[in-house]
Amino acid sequence: MGEFKVHRVRFFNYVPSGIRCVAYNNQSNRLAVSRTDGTVEIYNLSANYFQEKFFPGHESRGTEALCWAGGQRLFSAGLNGEILEYDLQALNIKYTLDAFGGPIWSMTASPSGSQLLVGCEDGSVKLFEVTPEKIQFARNFDRQKSRILSLCWHPAGTHVAAGSLDYISVFDVKSGSIIRKMVLDRQHLGVTKSRCIVWGVAFLSDGTVISVDSVGKVQLWDSATGTLVKSHLVANADVQSIAVADQEDSFVVGTAEGTVFHFQLVSMTSNSSEKQWVRTKPFQHHTHDVRAVAHSPTALISGGTDTHLVIRPLMERVEVKNYDAALRKITFPHRRLISCSKRRQLLLFQFAHHLELWRLGSTSATGKNGDTLPLSKNADHLLHLKTKGPENIICSCVSPCGSWIAYSTASRFFLYRLKYERDNISLQRVSKLPSFLRSALHILFSEDSTKLLVASNQGSLHIVHLSEGSFKHLHTFQPQSGTVEAMCLLAVSPDGNWLAASGTSAGVHVYDLHHLKLHCTVPAYNFPVTALAIAPNTNNLVIAHSDQQVFEFSIPEKQYTEWSRSLQKQGFHQLWLQRDTPITHISFHPKRPMHILLHDAYMFCIIDKSLPLPNEKTVLYNPLPPKNESDVFLRRTTHGFKMSKIYKPLLFMDLLDERTLVAVERPLDDIIAQLPPPIKKKKFGT
């Protein structure tokens, strides 16, 4: 792999927001996740659980409910009393609508997807029609005395169950009237609580209503008679979430103790047709409250305060026992939050509402491989740049020369000029920006820092020339097709002649920046692009996809390189394909044109194109060779993929120069330490 001096950075104090809601779309096999800061993420479960889209958060837009309707349309609602629809192409908010019922606690779509119901603070249940352009208010159901905390439609679309404080109501959809009310027992282990909060309800085809509540119970009700059929005490704290499989043969609940319980409908005896709900499996993959759960055909999905999104496969429902059956725990966003100025040894860290600029430390000490060297100069925190307004930062970048910083929110674009005088730094905002620079999904500077490249959410790419005293718009590349496709990833060649852009449809377009025209489009591939970069000298474009495939495309020749064709012909090593985190960054060695450097959250790899490709008989993760190396061992370990798992979780890694790497890690224990304390559970013998 070679010997590098590594700046091991652990002062990026990033803490993801907790998960508040999840919504699974069975038609597209996608999962929507909302976080406590209002951020909404879309995961493509068919594309190796890749986070293919996200919508930035907003301080006044905390999400309490999230659902899919009308096929591929996504809606959310929250305590500001508004319903939002998301534009999944342009990646922005399509519109907002006030429900006029105070804070919204719950929302659900009808089985047909043509109607939405929201439950409000004032006790109202409001029905909306989903039209092609937007939603329209239809009517109110009978108002209740307390807030509506949970809602669920009957699969036939004729009735609705609503959970409140101390009771569950069953509505007739046609009339909007209550036809049944079930009162809950507030007792927990012999102690009567002041309130019983119905956090979640589910309505089954046979008329059974399942409720989860604040006294730790999962209860099954007969909606026709209003009687309690079965009660399961599963926790000493709140049961906060529930989701049912489409086949209605299993459901999952999440508790405030961090436990997820799986219930299944099983036959009482081998010859009996009588079935009963049985708690079969408890899972403890969370440390804090499990605020949201979902049930896909093959997995249980959960998320909560500890920020982890956990996908727990149901082994009996996974046809092929391969890496798809492995537990997934997603913590970090599948996009870069860090940029680097190699020339000045700077790192720019992106947080929700501020940026931090750091200068790396240095050492004059020397040592052997594996030694930790003492710093002769500590890292400097040069700048803390706080945003104005309630919107989260979408993207940011520091220029290679370290003299420019740009960032964007959903409605504003900011550009700053930095000047360095000895140990002091001054910041000057560029105030007169062109009107088209309102918002960006990705920002990039050219290698010489003279060009600013901006991808807007309307599918256009803006090229701007920068100099100390001027700001000139050079060109705008318009979307290639009639539909708006947001460009999420950009890569510029070191010579400044080529720009590669990838959009939400997994296509990659290459633009000629010298002649300001589209040069070519890379052949389409079925999986989203996770990272891309253009190599110096050769101008070969290296593309990583969510299924862990890596391609090399010659921009001058408009075709895949011979090395890439050989790699695809032989295929990747099975252990490489089984990795469950996407490649998020690609770079190149300035003096070794045959080397490609890339990393995901748990692995750093140098691909040496001059060496043989690994096959299934080779050892992919190269251990240190023994002192007495045998020819057999050398043949099994000498290949072009040199991998290291020393640094993890790895949020960013890049070459500063030909002998120096910078690696930014974020240990999970540091994140957990900054979360609120979990509920303490009494253990046996304590």
Swiss-Prot record:
Cellular component terms (Gene Ontology): 90S preribosome; chromosome; fibrillar center; nucleolus; small-subunit processome; t-UTP complex
Disulphide-bonded residues: none
Cross-link (Glycyl lysine isopeptide (Lys-Gly) (interchain with G-Cter in SUMO2)): 321
Location in or out of the cell: Nucleus, Nucleolus; Chromosome
InterPro entries reported for this sequence: UTP4, WD40/YVTN_repeat-like_dom_sf, WD40_repeat_dom_sf, WD40_rpt
Coiled coil ranges: none
Keyword Nucleus assigned: yes
Start and stop residues of the WD repeats: 14-53, 57-96, 99-138, 143-181, 193-231, 234-273, 285-322, 324-359, 435-474, 482-521, 524-563
Modification after translation: May be phosphorylated during mitosis; may control the association of this protein with WRD43 and UTP15.
Pfam families: WD40 (PF00400)
Keyword Repeat among record annotations: yes
GO biological process assignments: maturation of SSU-rRNA; maturation of SSU-rRNA from tricistronic rRNA transcript (SSU-rRNA, 5.8S rRNA, LSU-rRNA); regulation of DNA-templated transcription; ribosomal small subunit biogenesis
Expressing tissues: Expressed in liver.
Keywords from the UniProt entry: Chromosome, Isopeptide bond, Nucleus, Phosphoprotein, Repeat, Ribosome biogenesis, rRNA processing, Transcription, Transcription regulation, Ubl conjugation, WD repeat
Function: Ribosome biogenesis factor. Involved in nucleolar processing of pre-18S ribosomal RNA. Part of the small subunit (SSU) processome, first precursor of the small eukaryotic ribosomal subunit. During the assembly of the SSU processome in the nucleolus, many ribosome biogenesis factors, an RNA chaperone and ribosomal proteins associate with the nascent pre-rRNA and work in concert to generate RNA folding, modifications, rearrangements and cleavage as well as targeted d Involved in SSU pre-rRNA processing at sites A', A0, 1 and 2b.
Subunit and interaction comment: Interacts with HIVEP1 Interacts with NOL11. Part of the small subunit (SSU) processome, composed of more than 70 proteins and the RNA chaperone small nucleolar RNA (snoRNA) U3. May be a component of the proposed t-UTP subcomplex of the ribosomal small subunit (SSU) processome containing at least UTP4, WDR43, HEATR1, UTP15, WDR75.
Name of the protein this chain belongs to: U3 small nucleolar RNA-associated protein 4 homolog
